[in-house]
């Protein structure tokens, strides 16, 4: 009987054992569910604390969000509009503050079950997604929001006086920040497609004509305002993010 199949089997076992995480302790389904429940409770408590703190500091947060709207007077058009808008803003701030902590809990939950090779891929992607979302929000606040507001304020300023609803303005700002943060996740999606072998970097580069059209559509859909300036800036950012993802995949040889 040939020993070659047995040697191949032993080699595969040794290779797989090297990829397994250290101190891997088996857990029952009940233990997994209990750990998941505990981490979910931790995230929920953290969210409540973050939202509560945000509500107590709502005046400072409102002033920060109002900063891009220079020279605009905000009106309360309905009873309790400011109060209910403050609750909404506090909830959104709580979600944003909780997201990194939630991702951290997800990492702690899935980490013991990952091989060393999977850890090298998944952990940077999770951390990178948080960083890119935050960068997208900062880009929206310092670039997109001022550009959109300046256009909307200056257009027809000699005819009508800009008096804006407090609630509608903050819906506009929050939607702009959130949608831009999502748009900045494009390189993460490209990395997942490239690493999984679904689409290569060369194929992504060859599709540049279609990407220009798609980026224009994304810029029109994700920007809550209809002004061309904001849409052009958003489309340009989407293109830059896309080609950045292609360059990263080329560097990774995917």
From Swiss-Prot:
It is found in: Plastid, Chloroplast membrane. The chain crosses the membrane at residues 41-61, 64-84, 91-111, 125-145, 146-166, 172-192, 204-224, 232-252. This is Uncharacterized tatC-like protein ycf43. It is a multi-pass membrane protein. It comes from the Eukaryota. HAMAP family: TatC. PROSITE patterns: TATC (PS01218). Its main location: plastid. Belongs to the TatC family. The lineage of its organism: Eukaryota, Rhodophyta, Bangiophyceae, Bangiales, Bangiaceae. It comes from Porphyra purpurea (Red seaweed). The keyword Transmembrane helix applies.
């Amino acid at each position: 009987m040939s020993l070659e199949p047995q040697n191949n089997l032993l080699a595969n076992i040794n290779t797989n054992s090297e990829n397994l995480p250290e101190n891997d302790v088996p857990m029952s389904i009940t233990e997994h569910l209990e750990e998941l429940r505990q981490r979910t409770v931790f995230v929920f408590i953290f969210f409540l604390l973050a939202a509560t703190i945000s509500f107590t500091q709502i005046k400072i947060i409102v002033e920060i969000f109002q900063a891009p709207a220079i020279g605009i007077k905000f009106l309360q058009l309905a009873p309790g509009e400011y109060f209910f808008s403050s609750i909404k803003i506090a909830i959104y701030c709580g979600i944003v503050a909780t997201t990194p902590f939630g991702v951290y809990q997800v990492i702690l939950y899935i980490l013991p079950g990952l091989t060393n090779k999977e850890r090298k891929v998944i952990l940077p992607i999770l951390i990178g997604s948080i960083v890119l979302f935050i960068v997208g929000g900062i880009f929206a606040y310092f670039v997109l929001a001022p550009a959109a507001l300046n256009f909307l304020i200056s257009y027809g300023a000699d005819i009508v006086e800009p008096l804006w609803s407090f609630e509608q303005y903050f819906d506009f700002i929050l939607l702009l920040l959130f949608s831009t943060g999502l748009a900045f996740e494009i390189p993460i999606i490209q990395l997942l497609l490239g690493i999984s072998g679904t689409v290569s970097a060369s194929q992504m580069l060859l599709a540049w004509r279609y990407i220009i059209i798609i980026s224009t559509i994304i810029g029109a859909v994700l920007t809550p305002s209809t002004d061309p300036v904001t849409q052009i800036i958003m489309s340009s950012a989407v293109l830059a993010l896309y080609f950045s993802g292609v360059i990263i995949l080329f560097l990774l040889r995917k």
